[in-house]
Amino acid sequence: MFKAFKEFAFRGNVIDLAVGVILGAAFSGIIKSLVDSIFMPLIGIIIGGIDVKGLSVEVGNANLLYGQFLQASIEFILIAFALFLFVKGINAFRRKEETTEEVAAPTTEEKLLTEIRDALVRQQNERMK
């Protein structure tokens, strides 16, 4: 049982996922700070000096804080866009890596097979003459 768990836990995909979650959490904090400290104050200035996070509406005894929802929505959009750009960059890098691997010099086996093919073609051409 322990051996199976160890194989599962230390496979590349699980470790990659763990690193991704940790980096995602750290990145989320950076984006939250960017939105809270820079974007929302700028949006507040643009719409007339209003603190966007404090926007709310009272409905009966309830206070609906739609400003906080707006701020969280902007954070989500920025995080999603940044992750989109990151994944797009990674995919472009992988495609570039794959093309360089495809262009790599032929192996010894491939060279030998090419020579054999060429020799067979020459033999066939000589027989037809």
From Swiss-Prot:
Primary location = membrane
**One GO CC annotation, please?**
plasma membrane
Question: PROSITE patterns this protein is in?
Answer: MSCL
Q: Which domain of life is it from?
A: Bacteria
Q: Where in the cell is it found?
A: Cell membrane
Query: One MF term in GO for this entry?
Result: mechanosensitive monoatomic ion channel activity
Q: Which UniProt keywords apply?
A: Cell membrane, Ion channel, Ion transport, Membrane, Transmembrane, Transmembrane helix, Transport
**InterPro entries, A to Z:** Mechanosensitive_channel_CS, MS_channel, MSC/AndL, MscL_channel
Question: What residue range is the signal peptide?
Answer: none
Transmembrane spans: 8-28, 30-50, 67-87
Record has RNA-binding as a keyword = no
Q: How does it assemble?
A: Homopentamer.
NCBIfam families membership: mscL (TIGR00220), PRK00567.1-4 (NF001843)
Q: Which protein are we looking at?
A: Large-conductance mechanosensitive channel
Q: What is the protein's species of origin?
A: Exiguobacterium sibiricum (strain DSM 17290 / CCUG 55495 / CIP 109462 / JCM 13490 / 255-15)
Q: What are the top taxonomic ranks of the organism?
A: Bacteria, Bacillati, Bacillota, Bacilli, Bacillales
Underlying gene = mscL
